[in-house]
Design a protein with these regions (language model features):
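Conserved core of the PLP fold type I
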Residues: 55, 60-161
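Short, basic, glycine/proline-bearing loop/turn elements
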Residues: 1-5, 146-149
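N-terminal "arm"/small-domain region of PLP-dependent enzymes with the aminotransferase-like
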Residues: 2-66, 77-80, 84
Length: 161
């Protein structure tokens, strides 16, 4: 069943992570994947996250399936956090759904976009994560890239954006 699968391209960010681990320089700084790490390189669980998890577990009374959109109460609170009293919320023009992480969110969005507009084109930054382009293409979307970084000035390329 899997004999026809081809290896995917390596992710340059993951390659940087491997090089970082091998670098003996004690002053190195990991700017690869966007997670907080302490001085020992450990990705700590922040106290506020532990408290939120405990609060959630203490009040959870069921493991029943909650539906495709996830926890609707959580969704409404996230919408209020993201948009505040913006008219798009008041007019009911926002829809929120839980996803299994960032890549899962992109895939769900890609499938939704393809269904809503089969001719849609997705624009991704260049550079982007290695899986982003193939993820959108696998959903049947056209993908184009735009630059956001100006290597000569080491700043944003606002004209390209």
């Amino acid at each position: 069943m899997f004999s026809q699968l081809q290896p995917v391209a390596t992710d340059p960010i993951l390659g940087l992570m491997a090089a970082y681990k091998e670098d003996p320089n004690p002053l190195k700084v990991d700017l690869g994947v966007g997670v907080y790490k302490d001085e020992q390189g450990h990705t700590a669980v922040l106290d506020c996250v532990k408290k939120a998890e405990k609060l959630r577990l203490d009040h959870e009374d069921s493991k029943t399936y909650i539906g495709m959109a996830g926890d609707l109460s959580f969704n409404r609170h996230i919408e209020q956090l993201a948009f505040g009293p913006h008219k798009v919320l008041l007019e009911g023009r926002v829809t929120t759904a839980h996803t299994p992480g960032g890549t899962g969110a992109l895939r769900v969005a890609a499938e939704f976009i393809k269904k809503a507009n089969p001719d849609a084109t997705i624009w991704v930054t260049s550079p982007t994560w290695a899986n982003h382009i193939s993820l959108f293409q696998a959903a049947g979307l056209k993908v184009k890239e735009y630059s956001y970084y100006d290597y000569s000035t080491k700043g944003l390329n606002e004209e390209a954006m």
